[in-house]
């Protein structure tokens, strides 16, 4: 199943990016940071100005993101592993620039990048 999921992700054009590329998208292309972790993970620390939509709610709440359809969207999960489903939902609904942060919030913290707590 994992190999199939990987091919789906690459077929649909969802790119994995590292923290350096994510910072460039955020700073220079006004990317939306979409945090799809659960409430407790998000409260423990998240990227500044991120939008929080838990993974299991993405099917019903993706319309909240409609105004970002043509902007880059950087999807954040705990370790980067579970963010494929939300990314696929966004792609399926016409979002053109969806990126998964490789290593998720863990990679962001390892790079000593800014984190805020609720």
Spell out what each predicted region is.
Residues 76-77:
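Metallo-beta-lactamase
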Residues 34:
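Active-site flanking residues adjacent to catalytic metal/cofactor-binding acidic residues
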Residues 1-21, 25-31, 39-72, 81-118:
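Rhodanese-like catalytic fold shared by cysteine-dependent sulfurtransferases
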């Amino acid at each position: 199943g994992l190999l199939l999921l990987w091919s789906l992700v690459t077929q649909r054009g969802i790119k994995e990016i590292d923290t350096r590329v994510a910072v460039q998208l955020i700073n220079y292309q006004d990317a939306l940071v979409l945090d799809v972790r659960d409430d407790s993970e998000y409260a423990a620390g998240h990227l500044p100005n991120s939008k929080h939509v838990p993974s299991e709610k993405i099917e019903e709440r993706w319309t909240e993101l409609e105004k970002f359809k043509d902007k880059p969207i950087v999807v954040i999960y705990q370790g980067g592993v579970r963010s494929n489903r939300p990314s696929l939902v966004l792609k399926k609904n016409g979002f053109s620039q969806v990126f998964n942060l490789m290593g998720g919030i863990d990679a962001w913290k390892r790079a000593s990048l800014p984190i805020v707590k609720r």
